[in-house]
Amino acid sequence: MAEEQAYHVSKGLECLKALRENPPDIEEIQEVSSLRDQTCNPGQENGTTGMQEEEDSQNLDESHEPTKGSNYVGHVPQNNPGCGERNTALVEAERPPREDIQPGPGIRCDHVYDHSGEEVKGIEDADSLVVPAGTVGNRGFERGEGSLDDSTEDSGEDYSEGNASSNWGYSFGLKPDRAADVSMLMEEELSALLRTSRNVGIQKRDGKTLQFPHNPEVRQGIRSVDPLKRGTEERSVSHGMGIVAGSTSGATQSALKSTGGSSEPSVSAGNVRQPAMNAKMTQKCKLESGTQLPPRTSNEAESDSEYDDELFSEIQEIRSAITKLTEDNQAILTKLDTLLLLKGETDSIKKQISKQNIAISTIEGHLSSIMIAIPGFGKDTGDPTANVDINPELRPIIGRDSGRPLAEVLKQPASSRGNRKDSGITLGSKGQLLRDLQLKPIDKESSSAIGYKPKDTAPSKAVLASLIRSSRVDQSHKHNMLALLKNIKGDDNLNEFYQMVKSITHA
């Protein structure tokens, strides 16, 4: 803490030296001072408020008075707007009697102490530096006069009104000719000192001026006519201050800086957001604690109704979309169930096919050991049925025992044929099949698998009608031919009709 105090003191000394060497233009100083007076002293017109602030400042000063000697040790608030911290430094100054307080010709920095009471080293120039200061007016140290009896006044009173310079902290209720820390001088005191130094004849160097930063705007609150009730002996309901809302835009007004002193350690308030000057109203305020809302215009009502209609239509669209998605999901689930059923049926079909393959392989094994007798094979050449055409695709299948089936179908068994060698029959002669085992000769005049021979019989006419129906002829022609078929009599006429139908269907 001592290093910070020494740093601020050295910076203040450098600033004052620069001002003494390069004084600013008097016209610019007067212009800045007039602007500062207009913005920072609106509360001086109210005498009651000024007196109340003086009494409060005096109460604070008297609460810090020592019990010994005429020296006064107090806290000088140091405001650092950049980091939001408040530093205090112990000040030792001579305090003359209250009735003999007069503004001195200047302010002299004599000694600087830290919080532990030790003197700060390394600032020897502060003892010899004298800064001229004129009459400051109703600024700085003149604002602290009052009586000790006023300190019992209610502490809940609002001290944020009046002079804007009070927002920078409390000032002492005396008019000393010494100051403990040069860097603690307020902007108003610097302006007054520079104006006084200009009046005493300090020359100005061309092209070098001093620019003062603007004091942040402080919006004055509207005091209620009926103050809030103070503490009573019984519990009661408080209805608030009844403050009328000054802005309906929804922006939070910047709070006035507290003027009360604090003996507790300072706390950093970094990353504090700046107050919003204007913001869009987001919700309707409730008529509570005396807050009044402005009447709604017709345009606002129409915009709200349009907004409600658009919101309702959007909700309906979202609902319909959700319904459509639900239906699609239901259809997909139904198809999935169908696929599961088809999968089960496919598995059963595969099992049946495997069973049929096993049965077919079994039949093929049996067929390999069976001999199929072909009609006409082994017949005598003199037999009239021996000239029947044989299907060339049919071949005799011989089993494992090639001699056994032949001996069973021949006219004479093999045993009898082998014993009769003297009869002139050799073993290599062609055997004859038994007549009972021979097929009857095929009648070429009757219908068979070889060909169709129409006759005036019901089965023959039924076969012919089936041929007509299965043909690709128009329906009208089919009806005509079926009608003619019913009226035809005789084998010859039926044969001619058959030839005609064959020519029409194969055309």
Swiss-Prot record:
Q: Does the keyword Phosphoprotein apply?
A: yes
Keyword annotations:
Coiled coil, Phosphoprotein, Viral RNA replication
- Give residue spans, biased composition: Acidic residues: 147-160
Which CDD domains does the UniProt entry name for this protein?
Answer: MEV_P-protein-C_like
Query: Where in this chain does the entry annotate a coiled-coil region?
Result: 310-339
Specify residue ranges for compositional bias: Polar residues: 31-51, 246-271, 289-300
Q: Which domain of life is it from?
A: Viruses
Q: Where is this region: Multimerization?
A: 304-376
> What is a single molecular function from GO for this protein?
RNA binding
Q: Where are the stretches annotated Disordered?
A: 31-86, 123-172, 242-307
**Entry-annotated residues carrying Phosphoserine:** 151
Biological process (GO) annotations held by this record are:
DNA-templated transcription; viral genome replication
Q: How is it modified after translation?
A: Phosphorylation on serines by host CK2 is necessary for the formation of viral factories.
* Span list, region Interaction with the nucleocapsid (N-RNA): 459-507
Q: Name one Pfam family in it.
A: Paramyx_P_V_C
What the protein does comes down to: Essential cofactor of the RNA polymerase L that plays a central role in the transcription and replication by forming the polymerase complex with RNA polymerase L and recruiting L to the genomic N-RNA template for RNA synthesis. Also plays a central role in the encapsidation of nascent RNA chains by forming the encapsidation complex with the nucleocapsid protein N (N-P complex). Acts as a chaperone for newly synthesized free N protein, so-called N0, allowing encapsidation of nascent RNA chains during replication.
Recorded domain comment: The N-terminus consists of a long intrinsically disordered tail. The central part contains the coiled-coil multimerization domain (PMD). Forms a four-stranded coiled coil structure. The C-terminus constitutes the alpha-helical domain that binds to the nucleocapsid (N-RNA complex).
Family per similarity comment: Belongs to the morbillivirus P protein family.
What does the record note on quaternary structure? Homotetramer. Interacts (via multimerization domain) with polymerase L; this interaction forms the polymerase L-P complex. Interacts (via N-terminus) with N0 (via Ncore); this interaction allows P to chaperon N0 to avoid N polymerization before encapsidation. Interacts (via C-terminus) with N-RNA template; this interaction positions the polymerase on the template for both transcription and replication.
Q: Which named protein is this?
A: Phosphoprotein
According to its UniProt entry, this protein's organism is Canine distemper virus (strain Onderstepoort) (CDV)
